[in-house]
Amino acid sequence: MMVIRPVERSDVSALMQLASKTGDGLTSLPANEATLSARIERAIKTWQGELPKSEQGYVFVLEDSETGTVPGICAIEVAVGLNDPWYNYRVGTLVHASKELNVYNALPTLFLSNDHTGSSELCTLFLDPDWRKEGNGYLLSKSRFMFMAAFRDKFNDKVVAEMRGVIDEHGYSPFWQSLGKRFFSMDFSRADFLCGTGQKAFIAELMPKHPIYTHFLSQEAQDVIGQVHPQTAPARAVLEKEGFRYRNYIDIFDGGPTLECDIDRVRAIRKSRLVEVAEGQPAQGDFPACLVANENYHHFRVVLARTDPATERLILTAAQLDALKCHAGDRVRLVRLCAEEKTA
């Protein structure tokens, strides 16, 4: 059975294996054991209540409960930009006009922004390609909403998610090549690695401070502004079905879109509800796949189960209860996947 749980120190080798499969552009999952170990420690200290809000971050893994295999990771940063500035570009417009010459030009322009400072961030979503089946991706991505719904007071009113931009298999980013490289004088993969390992001072030191007309970029770079890596398209679709939208903010490195949503308008958070759980044999029928989560902060668990999403009493097998670390009579959080999201 596939189950979501908090990360543990013993997961570092599994996370290293996942990091080796991501390719360039997933900044928050670098193939660096010291960085990943520090990330795990920060998550553990977050759960233990030892960190200020500016440093808090939760990390979860997807585990096969039968084999112990860990094929996926996802995370939530509680409040971005309160220690180190959180940069992106806002894609806006500057108008240049002359009535005398009968000229009017509205020019797309990039403005350096810290507008999302303090927002909670969905990040570090990666699922091993061999495990992208049977609803694992939905479970991995949406489990975070179940945690946020259960512990709403831990998070801020706005949630953002940076989507990986267009980068080819050789690490070539058209947006970086046309813009970032001119200021940073390094390859995309190097800048991405430095940022992922916490060495972010160079961003503030070298970033262009003035607005940039997108027409000055190559056509190839202009074409990928706000576009996602092909492997990231499904993740974007999942978030958009939950209510996230692109509001003209993009990543400063690869030009990928930043999606955002008010936390209380996220579908899975808004529609999830608590029901009593009982042990037994679930009723047979053509029921939709639903997310089921316990309400245990330190031992949080989420699984997928086929059931009636409107039920007031959820029947689960002994194995499902064990995976959720629940007992008959406990209350669990329940919400169905979106109607079009299939798990078979």
Swiss-Prot record:
Q: Per UniProt, where does succinyl-CoA bind?
A: 125
Q: Which InterPro entries match?
A: Acyl_CoA_acyltransferase, Arg_succinylTrfase_AstA/AruG, Arginine_N-succinylTrfase
**Involved pathway(s):** Amino-acid degradation; L-arginine degradation via AST pathway; L-glutamate and succinate from L-arginine: step 1/5
Note the Gene3D superfamilies from the entry: 2.40.40.20
Give the Enzyme Commission number.
2.3.1.109
- Name one process (GO BP) from the record: arginine catabolic process to glutamate
HAMAP family annotated for this entry? Answer: AstA
Give the NCBIfam families listed for this entry.
Answer: arg_catab_AOST, arg_catab_AstA, PRK10456.1
Q: What is its biological role?
A: Catalyzes the transfer of succinyl-CoA to arginine to produce N(2)-succinylarginine.
Family membership: Belongs to the arginine N-succinyltransferase family.
Protein name per UniProt: Arginine N-succinyltransferase
